[in-house]
């Protein structure tokens, strides 16, 4: 089934509306009533209580292992999503994702997630030569729902970012949240890099190091 996007006339030329949001055009229901986004991805509308209850139930069931489980779920989600996006990108833009500017590809990948309520982001490649990528996340769906509980909670995002950035870089990456809205911060911050660097950062985080201290030690 070919991808169908809304179009608009700009001067004498008709263009596809790529990263364009209107509720009645972004969210659609199929013939069975399932809610989909414009890219034919299944979505759900859930209240904050659902997110909080899911998080707490998992922690009560498996304890400290919950963070790793959520990270792995996020990683698999990100891996599947970026692979699907790679196919959609070529269909939508008529060129391979690998031929496009990496930042254009990343923004186009994240846009539907932001439109669906997963938050806004910015990323920092200034230390890429050292093998490090930083991602700032604003209005995390998880952290905003959970509130200030004094610890990081956005493990899904950490895994998802590691998978997506790693796929685009053609290099396996690991991820770690080093600052979170649920710790009283204004936004969440994630560190992406090799498993060795992330393991070191994770050790320092467990010892109580702040995001600034972790970055300085790296």
Name each model feature, range by range:
Residues 154-170:
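Active-site helix/loop of acyl-thioester processing domains in fatty-acid/polyketide metabolism
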Residues 1-134, 139-156, 174-218:
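N-terminal accessory segment detector
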